[in-house]
Amino acid sequence: MEVILLEKVANLGNLGDKVKVRAGYGRNFLVPYGKAVPATKANVEQFEARRAELEKSAAEKLSAAQARAEAINGKEVTIVAKSGDEGKLFGSVGTKDIADAVTALGVEVEKSEVRLPEGALRNTGEYEVDVQMHTDVTATVKVIVVGE
């Protein structure tokens, strides 16, 4: 299935690229989420007519993401959680907890933007956590988990 990308998609291409993807990926993810349209003649013509508008909105999203990233990059957030004697938490600190703590700093962050490659934090200590605001923009936040 060939699609035209309406925004930059990681590991696939940039705005306006015509790429060949598996039918299920195109039908079930790219098209419903507004990231692409099927590459029919009508859609190609319509895309070329709207290209400048789409590029402008993509540039605005990128600059907004960069501004948000600069506001939180290098900041520290402290999260208090119940823990045992050896620093092991009862439960864990997940993406929602980190997103809420960063949002309390004054920058709106969704839990889907927080990247925890090793999974939820289960011990007390200091962690470097990436917050991916945009495909090209990532900020690093220092998360300090303190036992209660």
Curated annotation (Swiss-Prot):
- What Gene Ontology terms describe what this protein does at the molecular function level? rRNA binding; structural constituent of ribosome
Q: Which GO terms describe its biological process?
A: translation
Q: Pfam families under this entry? A: Ribosomal_L9_C, Ribosomal_L9_N
- Extract the PROSITE patterns matched here: RIBOSOMAL_L9
Question: What Gene3D superfamilies does the entry give?
Answer: Ribosomal protein L9, C-terminal domain, Ribosomal protein L9, N-terminal domain
Function of the molecule: Binds to the 23S rRNA.
Q: What is this protein called?
A: Large ribosomal subunit protein bL9
Q: Which organism is it from?
A: Hahella chejuensis (strain KCTC 2396)
- What lineage, starting at the top, does this entry show? Bacteria, Pseudomonadati, Pseudomonadota, Gammaproteobacteria, Oceanospirillales
